[in-house]
Amino acid sequence: MSALIPASEVILRHQDTFSDKQVVIAGDVQDLLPARLEARSVKVHTAWFHHRQTLARALGEQAVQFGLVADAALGGGCDTLIYYWPKNKPEALFQLTNLLSLLPLGCDVFVVGENRSGVRSAEPMLAAWCPLAKIDSARRCGLYHGELVQQPRFDAEAFWQSYQLEDVVIKTLPGVFSRDGLDNGSQLLLSTFDRPFQGHVADIGCGTGVLSAVLAKGAAGVQLTLSDAHAPALAASRATLAVNGLQGEVLAGDVYSAISGRFDMIISNPPFHDGMQTNLKAAETLIRGALNHLRIGGELRIVANAFLPYPDLLDAVFGNHQVLVQNGRFKVYQAIHQVKRSRDKGPKRR
């Protein structure tokens, strides 16, 4: 999170605009621009746990909010919003409706993002609340500015959706992976569970909680720990467990950062993007750290795009792997913890 992304470089072209402003920065914040921006004050809202950790170290705990929604304290005294447009338009609508409902009329609003992310959609989206005009174009990004003329009404409940998988209800929110239905990769992974599983399961990068919910529904012997870095995913997973009458611990964390102890199985459909960029770091951390969180005989079972270079890494870490099932796009990998490394302990929260 050290180098600035192109959108931040565009913001810094307008540094003088912010020198006497009280700024809130939100949206898809991926770097330390909030710490480098010269302003009267800077506060941040992020929906990503790992970015929250980095920004809190740079700005202080009180300057950074992490969560599904921003609260009124964030907007207090603010006269400027800088919003980083995410790649997901419904998530942008959710976040901007929330943020603009908290900010005072007359607040300056800047929206910045890569052209390929669809940042042009900001103009029609905000037309009724904050008419925007494009004020800069550089680094394949657009920067838009407007003034808040009407506060939107924000109702988080109105953004919830759900879908059904046989007798399992999946709850979901804007920005959560596979919001509109079960993705093909997760479907392939679930197809490998052809008999009830018993034991402690860690669902890393849990998203909607679909993997855990399907695995645990009707299987009384499953104990669940779910973790994700994305606040909407955490909310969706908690809601999915609740609506299906399932118990489980849902933790905000970056891969294994929130959990300790050992499990009988780790399951995941790991992401390979960070914003608009390809990034295999999370999946590599998942694989490299798995032995520290598996009991002897425990397994890592993940689904991944077939072209991703995971077989060699699995062999290097586990000394084994097999492909349980594959189709044209995806493979489900299984690797078994066969070598005793330290005394096993049940999963627990740090």
From Swiss-Prot:
Disulfide bonds: none annotated. Pfam families: MTS (PF05175), MTS_N (PF08468). It is an enzyme of class 2 (transferase). It is found in: Cytoplasm. Monomer. Specifically methylates the guanine in position 1207 of 16S rRNA in the 30S particle. This is Ribosomal RNA small subunit methyltransferase C. It comes from Sodalis glossinidius (strain morsitans). The lineage of its organism: Bacteria, Pseudomonadati, Pseudomonadota, Gammaproteobacteria, Enterobacterales.
